[in-house]
């Protein structure tokens, strides 16, 4: 048994915590080299303000605290409060909240990071995609994110394509975690797109108008993406270009409720339509 796994089990026993993979997705990282890579990928400096979601037993948290100006932690499982208070005695720059990150609206940090289950990661991205305070994030998620992103047939994949540049940093074998999960993990980095092309503006509009029917969001997204072109599209022209997309049953749903097949058709249009690719001011 490696030392970090032994330390993990020791702390769990000390604080009388039994990991709960079902309700909280708790699989603790017990591979020390990956903790170092995670902290390094966060690129924190002594001026950095960091938001960490789900600190676990605090191994990554302490690595960040040694480098950053401050670290604010959100932990939904109240069993970890005593552990966090003990870490706070050692690191005065730690702030924590025993609450659900999805109820938080402040993402004005230099780095947002955490090891997250898919059940939290997708809702988190839905919450922060329109929040321009979010600039850079480092996350451990399921390795299936790479396949999902490549297939571009999910809300998560299109959200990432529209608003972020993604880097797949490191595949994490499931044996790196305790208790061992059913699938491998993936360390990723997300950076908000600064230069937005007409092509990506089209996708962004779909989500920024997510409360509208998909066919209306598609039409308005296409019109808005043409603003820097020689000719700004009319509603009639955009409907004609979108063709069957606006006639399919899913087009009457919000983009967040559309089927995988419809989302893939949107991505195919995104790939094939002749956007000018100009960078918007």
Question: Across the structure, where does each feature detected by a protein language model lie?
Answer:
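An accessory alpha-helical subdomain
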Residues: 183-271
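Catalytic cores of RNA-modifying enzymes
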Residues: 1-205, 256, 262-281
């Amino acid at each position: 048994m490696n030392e970090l796994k032994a330390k993990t089990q020791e702390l769990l026993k000390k604080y009388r915590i039994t990991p709960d993979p079902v309700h909280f997705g708790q699989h603790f990282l017990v591979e020390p080299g990956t903790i170092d890579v995670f902290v390094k990928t966060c690129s924190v400096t002594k001026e950095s303000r960091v938001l960490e979601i789900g600190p676990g037993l605090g191994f990554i948290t302490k690595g960040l605290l040694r480098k950053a100006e401050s670290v604010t932690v959100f932990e939904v499982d109240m069993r970890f409060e005593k552990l966090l208070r003990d870490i706070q005695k050692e690191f005065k720059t730690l702030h924590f909240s025993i609450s659900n990150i999805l109820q938080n609206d402040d993402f004005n940090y230099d780095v947002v990071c955490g090891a997250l289950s898919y059940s939290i990661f997708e809702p988190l991205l839905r919450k922060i995609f329109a929040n321009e305070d979010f600039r850079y994030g480092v996350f451990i998620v399921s390795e299936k994110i790479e396949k999902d992103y490549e297939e571009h047939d999910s809300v998560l994949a299109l959200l990432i394509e529209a608003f972020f540049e993604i880097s797949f940093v490191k595949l994490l074998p499931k044996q790196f975690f305790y208790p061992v999960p059913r699938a491998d993990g993936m360390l990723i980095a997300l950076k908000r797109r600064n230069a937005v092309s007409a092509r990506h503006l089209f996708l962004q509009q779909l989500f920024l108008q997510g409360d509208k029917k998909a066919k209306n969001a598609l039409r308005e997204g296409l019109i808005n993406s043409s603003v820097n072109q020689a000719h700004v599209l009319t509603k009639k022209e955009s409907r004609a270009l979108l063709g069957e997309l606006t006639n399919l049953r899913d087009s009457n749903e919000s983009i967040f409720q559309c089927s995988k097949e419809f989302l893939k058709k949107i991505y195919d249009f995104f790939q094939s339509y002749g956007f000018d690719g100009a960078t918007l001011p």
